[in-house]
UniProtKB/Swiss-Prot annotation:
There are two genes coding for HUT1 in strain JEC21, due to a translocation and segmental duplication on chromosomes 8 and 12. Keywords: Endoplasmic reticulum, Glycoprotein, Membrane, Sugar transport, Transmembrane, Transmembrane helix, Transport. Residues 31-51 are annotated as: Disordered. It comes from Cryptococcus neoformans var. neoformans serotype D (strain JEC21 / ATCC MYA-565) (Filobasidiella neoformans). Its main location: endoplasmic reticulum. May be involved in specific transport of UDP-Gal from the cytosol to the Golgi lumen. Involved in the maintenance of optimal conditions for the folding of secretory pathway proteins in the endoplasmic reticulum. One of its GO terms (molecular function) is UDP-galactose transmembrane transporter activity. InterPro entries: SCL35B1-4/HUT1. The gene is HUT1-A. This is UDP-galactose transporter homolog 1.
Amino acid sequence: MGVLRLAVCISGVYAAFLLWAIAQERLSKPFPSVHPHPHQQPHSPSDPPPGDKFPSPLFLNFAQALASSLSALCYLSFKAWRDGWKGRGLGQLLGLKEVFGKSQTALNGDAKANKKESELNEKTKEVVEKAPKPPKKSLLALLVQVSVFQTIASPIGFLALRHISYPTMVLGKSCKLIPVLLLNVLLYRRKFSPHKYIVVALVTVGISMFMLFAETSKKKKGGSDSMWGLVLLLVNLLIDGLTNSTQDQIFSSYPSYTGQQMMFTMALTTQIILLPLLVLPLPTNPISLLAHLPPPFGSSVPTSTLSFSPPAALESISFLLSHPSALAPLFAYALLGGLGQLFIFETIQHFGSLTLVMVTVTRKLFTMLLSVVVFEHRLTKGQWLGVGVVFAGIGVEAGMKRKDVMKKAKKD
């Protein structure tokens, strides 16, 4: 059952986010307007048709968060209906009792939590030895912590991309397994079996080689990478590690709290954070706010006129009305993101963040291998070597799991 569930989760993540990436790329391109701009110059048939780009990334994030919360709610409702509801109210369905009150785990003491955690670890084989745990935070505090991490991670990633090349960003993201592993050990004092460190090292090196030796890297590299951009990339990786390790801590400390309940809470929190930013007028140049502060804060900033842009929600709705061709990719982007999140949180709950990150960082590799078979694309020798290193890491993991299963079978 565990192998089948993992296979379904991996297939769901790959399929949903492969199509999601296509929708995301389409949303980054211009859309033709049904109302042509005045004084617009005619274009030749060889030129791409003129258009406008989607005005607000915040609106896109809000749409995906809304779709994620609805997807989680539908999943939880269907699961409760299949189980006959059993007297479940909305609070129990969404896990609100665990979030805002004493959870059953807390009421029954640490003994029951430790027993459930050891059973979970026996299934995933990620944690093989219980370590002394730091004082348990409330579930609400941990969820707020994850929400803050998720909210600031994306803007920092976009800011880093302004100062480094895209291949450098992809290469850095391929090393995401390292901060997830280290922060689980350092922050929450988890102990992993020695082979886990070998697997993480092999997969990270293999994925890095696959990205580094790609032929497109040289073509796309273009500019140089600044030190500031590399610092932002490291901060982004650190935040990713904090997010995933804290999610592991939540499922370890609160076994009755499910992945889809966390997904709903995270998506709802994101909507609450983004809503004021969408409906309120924001300064067109936030740095200009410093000019209006009293000395010494505003003394070194040139005086500038403070202007505000229209609310992003109104701009986005107006854009969709005048550019109806953007509706389909926006709907696909939000829906596929919501469906993909279902598989992501299912993977975290049952197999841990290390397995999830291993799935996500190898997604591009397996997509490229599929393109080699289907479209006869070619890989460089360095990329094939990277593929071999990744499969060596996967082989080590599979071999150790088989060894554990055989040991358990002999005991029984």
